[in-house]
């Protein structure tokens, strides 16, 4: 399954969010506290304490945005968005190659997301690297844009060499655990929605939406 990159927060929202996070001087802690056993050895960053007021309020904001975005809904079919964390990496910090835990105390990870919160020009290094079969896809998006990718992927964060990288990461438990099934459903839904936008409702389109909905019911969990 190909990752989805998508604008999620507008400029005003992202700059307000960034200011709120950085104004909290007491809640940032060593990222190794939240890593699984395989990841702890390769994790090197700062994370906002999930129990802090700043983290709770702002993770809700991100979850609401993801849940209300039609493209994200169609792509990820989210049942539960969880484990949301704010992370900052300064010079010398990164996150080595790893795979995210399949099950966390907060839910199953079918899809992982990284929402970039500062502009790519403000830091060097810090790209999210997603391993493909023979290559590695490097991703560094403008502030407010999110990438959603299968949690089955090996991935890393390049070491930051200048400035500071600020992101929000989290996981999606999808109604559809299989990447392949989710990809098929996404294509069907995208095609039907495009037909609806172009030609309006029709009995034929009703049949396609019916098949889509019943396929989702059959494959979902
Ligand atoms: Fe990860």
Curated annotation (Swiss-Prot):
GO molecular function: 2-oxoglutarate-dependent dioxygenase activity; iron ion binding; L-ascorbic acid binding
UniProt key word Thylakoid: no
Cofactor binding mode and count: Binds 1 Fe(2+) ion per subunit.
Entry EC number(s): 1.14.11.-
Cofactor(s) the protein needs: Fe(2+); L-ascorbate
Domain Fe2OG dioxygenase: 80-174
A Pfam family recorded for this sequence: 2OG-FeII_Oxy_3
Keywords: Dioxygenase, Iron, Metal-binding, Oxidoreductase, Vitamin C
A GO biological process held by the record: DNA damage response
InterPro entries per record: Oxoglu/Fe-dep_dioxygenase_dom, PKHD_hydroxylase, Pro_4_hyd_alph, Pro_4_hyd_alph_FE2OG_OXY
Annotated positions binding Fe cation: 98, 100, 155
Domain of life the protein comes from: Bacteria
Chain positions recorded as 2-oxoglutarate binding sites: 165
Enzyme class, spelled out: oxidoreductase
The protein's name in its UniProt record: PKHD-type hydroxylase PMT_0286
